[in-house]
Amino acid sequence: MEHKSKRNFRITGALGLLFAAFTAIVATVDVSPIGPEQSSVGLAALNRFAAGLLGVNPLWYDITEWLGAVAVLSALGFAALGLCQLIRRRSLLKVDPRILLLGAFYIAVALVYLFFERVIINYRPVILDAGLEASYPSSHTVIAICIFGTAIMQFHHYLRGKTVWLVIMDSVTALLMAVTVIGRLLSGVHWFTDIAGGVLLSSALIMLYASAVSYVECRKKV
């Protein structure tokens, strides 16, 4: 278990460095004013090609907006589970560590979102409301992968031995995650690199959560 924990942390670090390197490339390589209001976009040739190929699809935008709400409701469900455990067990220390870590994980995801709202790498390829909006990394991609991905981890813990339910929940959750990410790309409200950056970032964050859970469980067995 200790070896697994160390391996997970190494993978987390590698994914984090990969995201940082990709972000640096997007911010500095082939930057051209191809966005709305002449906003500059990195890897402009690639992003222009993908945007021209996919166009803008309002239906997929609406679908992914609803799926984003489903992801948030899923997170609230696990928050409610933690609250129920706290009420029943009457001590924060008796709440399942993986649920406490999940709460910290959600906070970390929110902080990352706020950071990239301030530190803008790319603006959206379309203007949706009032003016330019931050687009990198795709927040819906990050939310979908982070929330649905960690939800699958909880199912594998709390539904152990219930094979049918586990298969159903895994399949539905993985489908929701995939449709959200692919649908967000097809919607045309993000550049291709926004989606790719979101996938890399959320992969690093999920591995960080998995590493923390593995570490805590390893410590408990010592």
Descriptions of predicted regions:
Residues M1-S74, E117-D129:
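N-terminal transmembrane-helix/juxtamembrane module of multi-pass inner/ER membrane proteins
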Residues A24-V31, A80-L86, L114, R118-N122, ...:
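Transmembrane helix-loop junctions and nearby membrane-interface residues
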Residues I34-E37, L83-I168:
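Membrane-interface loops
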Residues V70-A80, A104, A108-V112, S171-I182, ...:
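Lipid-exposed faces of alpha-helical membrane segments in multi-pass integral membrane proteins
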